[in-house]
């Protein structure tokens, strides 16, 4: 099961890399960039995600070089499969840049990481994915976070809520890869 979780994370890292290449190609004519649509991609310490404002942030502020550098350093731990260090780095990143351009992606990756660290922290994963949906409803990571929320609720034994999220992904993001993952998960588990 652990290896399957790690393989799933590797697929998301690869997908993020491809999205980042597309974003970079699109942004080549826009040096300033607005930060919208960015899709970069032991035991971990527990935390909660309650110190972020509760209002939707559909368009985060543009990233400054220090923020981008801190985000890339944290993401580097994901790529090198040092998941506990990645959790720490993303927590620190969000402490410094809670409303930054990369904040939605940091929450997404914390959600992913809390599912693969040992021991897994599904409630913290749920909190980060839900925060992404609530505060950044237009972010490119929303379909993936919604799919992951379906899986987290399934792991926690809440099949009804799981199905709601998975069906919502299929209904609202039918052309997105997360919709096919949701269909597959429903076929295998319901």
Task: Report the location of each language-model feature.
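Acidic, proline-/serine-/threonine-rich low-complexity intrinsically disordered segments
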Residues: 1-80
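Structural motif corresponding to the intra-repeat A-B loop/turn of tetratricopeptide repeats
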Residues: 80, 117-119, 156
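Short solvent-exposed coil/turn linkers within tandem alpha-helical repeat scaffolds
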Residues: 96-102, 134-141, 156, 171-180
């Amino acid at each position: 099961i652990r290896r399957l979780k790690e393989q799933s994370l590797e697929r998301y890292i690869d997908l993020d890399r491809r999205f980042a290449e597309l974003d970079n190609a699109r942004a080549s004519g826009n040096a300033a960039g607005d930060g919208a649509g960015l899709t970069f991609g032991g035991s971990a310490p527990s935390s909660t995600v309650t110190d972020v404002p509760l209002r939707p942030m559909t368009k985060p502020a543009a990233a400054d070089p220090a923020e981008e550098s801190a985000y890339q350093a944290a993401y580097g731990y994901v790529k090198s499969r040092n998941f506990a260090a990645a959790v720490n780095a993303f927590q620190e990143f969000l402490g410094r840049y809670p409303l930054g351009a990369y904040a939605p992606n940091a929450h997404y990756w914390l959600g992913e990481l809390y599912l693969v660290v040992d021991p897994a922290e599904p409630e913290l994963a749920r909190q980060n994915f839900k925060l992404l949906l609530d505060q950044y409803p237009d972010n490119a990571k929303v379909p993936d976070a919604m799919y992951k929320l379906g899986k987290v609720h399934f792991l926690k034994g809440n099949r009804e809520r799981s199905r709601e999220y998975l069906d919502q992904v299929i209904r609202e993001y039918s052309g997105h890869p997360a919709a096919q993952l949701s269909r597959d998960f429903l076929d295998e588990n319901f």
